[in-house]
Amino acid sequence: DVTGKGTSWQQLTSVSEEYRQKMFDNVKKEFIQENGLSNGDTTKRSDIFKDYQLSVNKDKRLSGTWTLEQYEGQYRAAMYAAVKSANPNWKPGQKFDTSILDNVKRESVESTLVKNGNRLVRNSIDVSV
C-alpha cells in the first residue's frame, strides 16, 4: 500500500449528512455534465474530500474519506441504473433526458445500502421513472 499505513483505514465510519449531500450533488452535476462518464480532469470531488478531511479529527480522515468514496460510487451507480432503466440502449457518453435523475434522491439511494465488510453495497434499488 502506497500510504505505508496498510489497509486498516479502509473501514466504514459515519460521515455527516452535510458531506454526503455535497458528494451526491457533485456526482449528479458531473453525471449530467459528462453524460454519465467520469472525467478526472474536471471533477470537483477532490475539493469535497479535502473540505471533509479538514472538518473532522485527524484520526477519522482516512476512514471517513474511504466511506465517502463508497457513498460516491453508490450514488453514481444509482444514477446509471436510473438512466439505463428509462433508456436501455443508453451508453455512458451519450446524451440523456436529465429529468430522469429527478427521482434519484440521496436518501433513497442510502436506504438501499448495507455494509458488506468494509464496503457499502446495494441491497436492492427501486428506481421509478
Name the predicted role of every residue range.
Residues 1-129:
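Type III/flagellar secretion export determinants
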